Structure formats: C-alpha cells, structure tokens
C-alpha cells in the first residue's frame, strides 16, 4: 500500500480482515499511512442486526461495537505490514480508557481514526477515536496481539 491517501472498499477490506457480516464493521478505508495511522468509515444503518435489541424504539450502536470497529481499523493497518497476513489474526489484549461521548444512531457515518502508539513484533497499542461529523463519539486505547490463524475445519 502507498504512503499517500488511499481508498479501499469493503472488498479490499475483506482481503485483509477475516471478519464477515454481521461483525465486519468497516465499509471503507480513506487514509492509510504505513505503520502509523489509518482512517476508516463505518456507515450505520437501521438494518444493523444489533439494533433489534439495543434499544427497541431508541436504537443506539453498542459502545463495545464502536471499540471493535476501532480495533478492526487498527487490524487492517497492522495486518498489511506482516508477512503471511492470511495466516494471522489480530486479537484484543486489552482496552483502556474507553470513553463514550455521543450516541451513534442509524444514519450516522462514523469516521474511525486510529494511530499506533507502540508496535513491537506481534504486539501493539493503538489510540482510536470515532467521530460522527466533527463530534467525538468514542475514544479508546486498545492493545492487540497478532496470533496464528487456526486452521479451517475440512468441511468449511
């Protein structure tokens, strides 16, 4: 991937991340700076599965899924830098200082800005922020680990 601003669509994202519906939470990557920063977009619609129960009559995107979207953006950044990326997964190792400032609701477009704080071998700490327009909706520091991807069962 290039250093300059670059757009990756959901098809490109699926080549990097193993997540699929209903847990793929990135629609587009709009900025990518190798080993440093990524900016991704999540378009939130009323059709999201989680709105069925969170909350009926007042749909709000669960905060934990906003943090997951931050982690997925970070995963897209990190996994592109390692050899054999299709044989690896990025998993949570910790969440620190998660703060939720504004509800995310159907119709919102969430801009996920993720910066690398530290990255050593297979472990990283990332600072992520989720914005709706110019309003900060969520911020969190996430720690993650790159691990081998388990082999797929033969019948899958």
UniProtKB/Swiss-Prot annotation:
Task: Mention any one GO cellular component term assigned to this protein in its UniProt record.
Answer: membrane
Which top EC class is named for this enzyme in its record?
Answer: lyase
Q: What is this protein called?
A: 3-hydroxyacyl-[acyl-carrier-protein] dehydratase FabZ
Origin: domain of life: Bacteria
What is annotated as the active site? 54
State what this protein does. Answer: Involved in unsaturated fatty acids biosynthesis. Catalyzes the dehydration of short chain beta-hydroxyacyl-ACPs and long chain saturated and unsaturated beta-hydroxyacyl-ACPs.
Any GO BP:
fatty acid biosynthetic process
Reported EC number(s) for this entry are 4.2.1.59
Query: Which organism does this record belong to?
Result: Koribacter versatilis (strain Ellin345)
């Amino acid at each position: 991937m290039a250093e300059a601003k670059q757009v990756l669509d959901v098809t490109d994202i699926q080549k990097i991340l193993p997540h699929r519906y209903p847990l793929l939470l990135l629609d587009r990557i709009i900025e990518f700076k190798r080993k440093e920063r990524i900016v991704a977009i999540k378009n939130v619609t009323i059709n999201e599965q989680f709105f069925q129960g969170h909350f009926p009559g007042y749909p709000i995107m669960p905060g934990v899924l906003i943090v997951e979207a931050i982690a997925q953006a970070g995963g897209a950044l990190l996994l592109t830098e390692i050899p054999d990326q299709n044989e690896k997964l990025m998993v949570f190792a910790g969440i620190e200082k998660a703060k939720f400032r504004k509800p995310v609701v159907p119709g919102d477009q969430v801009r996920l800005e993720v910066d690398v704080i530290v990255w050593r071998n297979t472990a990283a700490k990332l600072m992520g922020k989720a914005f709706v327009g110019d309003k900060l909706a969520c911020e969190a520091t996430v720690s993650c680990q790159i691990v081998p991807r388990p082999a797929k069962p033969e019948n899958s």
